[in-house]
Amino acid sequence: MPEHDLAALWEAHCRCEFETRDADATMATMVASPYVNHIPTMAGGVGHDQLKRFYKYHFIGANPPDMTMIPVSRTIGTDRLVDEMIVRFTHTTTIDWMLPGIPPTGRTVEVPLVAIVQFRDGKVAHEHIYWDQASVLVQIGKLDAQGLPVAGAAAAHKVLDPARPSNTLLGEAWAGSDGKPI
């Protein structure tokens, strides 16, 4: 059993990021030399000063006002927490951490996102954040999915509703295996 309530620590950290939108309060939930890496874009920071700069000028308060996170699952270990969620927003602002350099398109985005968070001494030590960047780029109109195995918003819908069809991107390959012995 973890020494600290990792879920409570993580939720306090997220409140500072998304509700109070306070970079100093966010940093106070972290170890002295933390790091955050949004893997698809390599956005974040290493060490207190670089990460505080990232939070203050490129993350906190820069997210679209309608951004919501729908929890899907949470796994808690002795020093780590893994959150699976769906992130929904309308692309009305420049989102440096997810879509660096891309001006607002006004389009809606729904994407599964996974946060892997490590804790040390009752504080957040680091975060690794993953999502399918191709699906995001398709949804904002920057990538044509024609002929590519990219699910777009359908991936988020499938996470929320496992009864939705699987293998839709397999096309003829999936149809060709129909009726074969299993």
Which residues does each PLM region occupy?
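C-terminal and inter-domain tail/linker signature
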Residues: 1-182
